């Protein structure tokens, strides 16, 4: 690995130099083990500890197939899907690997007794397989996490509809929390040159998800002047939605749960902020009964920020706890987009407020290559910024996943892989200086 790292840090190594570097036989990777999938049986979700299931193992370098690339990973980050993998909820991801392994002789590589996790990376291309023309060894890249086969016509209008669509590092093996990762070449995008490795790795999954859900025509299709209600507006997902709304000329109404989180939203430029804890909103009387009076009180509060207008778009991801209120406060003809259900999957709402007011509910999941590319392009232009708050070593990934699981973080948490320290990889210092305050906005919160 030293030769690879030396070539990356030299900034003078050519593509031919990288192509000539010998690949190691093995590399360090964050894994979960198939023989431990029952280790948390009988425990509540909260009591399942990723630090017990996550391992740092030496694993063999995978075979490189057509249309693929091996990437030296300088940094990665932790998403909720890595937490789900580590606590084996809602199902063991080894089920995904087994199913993928049955697809073809090549995909059998993924069905292993260990799962290398992680759905973000920033690094350098080491090798490309047959049929890869747009990328070469030595290219500095980030990767989005959509893995598709595109052998069915269903995926050719929107690749997220490919029947064989999977999330890399969650539903496939050889993910980004490792020193080397295996990706398809159509996952690669240029690394933003004003960001360090760990900063560039952080936006990936959540930035692309927020872009599709809020901006893309496959999501809400946000336009200038729209009133956008954003739940968890300072979090890993909501913080990107807040930035997209502000950059796109919309009016974000940011819902948070503390004054500290309200301050984060203000630092991004948001003015309309609702601290749901301070204002005492309780949308459920008990576990089975919602409180429409609270919906109405919430809607009245929103209209104080919008000049009496209702919400055009709701950026939903809490799910069960908030969904009834989300449907209620949306204007006639408005849109509720949802990409998750962190408070519960079984949603309840009064359907009269949906059908009689011609509202729409849109399910949104990650992003296609074009959407991920556009989201990354905005980061590269300095229009959207990383929300990196803390960085861990590869050895401490279990602690990073634990902190995300227990919601002890803000924004995104990063993980250094091959990068020996933070702050490396910046190629455009002038652009960085223009945006340094925004880049560091979430640091050490």
From Swiss-Prot:
Swiss-Prot/TrEMBL GO biological process terms: fatty acid metabolic process
Protein name: Crotonyl-CoA reductase
Species lineage: Bacteria, Bacillati, Actinomycetota, Actinomycetes, Kitasatosporales
InterPro entries tied to this protein: ADH-like_C, ADH-like_N, Crot_CoA_red, GroES-like_sf, NAD(P)-bd_dom_sf, PKS_ER, Zinc-ADH_QOR/CCCR
Keywords, sorted A to Z: Metal-binding, NADP, Oxidoreductase, Zinc
Thermal dependence of catalysis: Optimum temperature 40 degrees Celsius.
Family the UniProt entry places it in: Belongs to the zinc-containing alcohol dehydrogenase family. Crotonyl-CoA carboxylase/reductase subfamily.
pH profile of the protein: Optimum pH is 6.5.
Activity regulation field: Inhibited by NADPH at concentrations above 200 uM, by MgCl (30%), by ZnCl(2) (55%), and by CoCl, MnCl and CaCl (100%). Also inhibited by iodoacetamide, N-ethylmaleamide, the thiol group inhibitor beta-chloromercuribenzoate, palmitoyl-CoA and myristoyl-CoA.
Classification via Pfam families: ADH_N, ADH_zinc_N
One annotated GO molecular function: NADP binding
EC number in record: 1.3.1.86
Sites where the protein binds Zn(2+): 149
Cofactor: Zn(2+)
Organism: Streptomyces avermitilis (strain ATCC 31267 / DSM 46492 / JCM 5070 / NBRC 14893 / NCIMB 12804 / NRRL 8165 / MA-4680)
Function per UniProt: Catalyzes the conversion of crotonyl-CoA to butyryl-CoA. It uses only NADP as electron donor. May have a role in providing butyryl-CoA as a starter unit for straight-chain fatty acid biosynthesis.
Subunit structure, as described in the record: Homodimer.
Reaction(s) catalysed by this chain's protein: butanoyl-CoA + NADP(+) = (2E)-butenoyl-CoA + NADPH + H(+)
CDD domains (alphabetical): crotonyl_coA_red
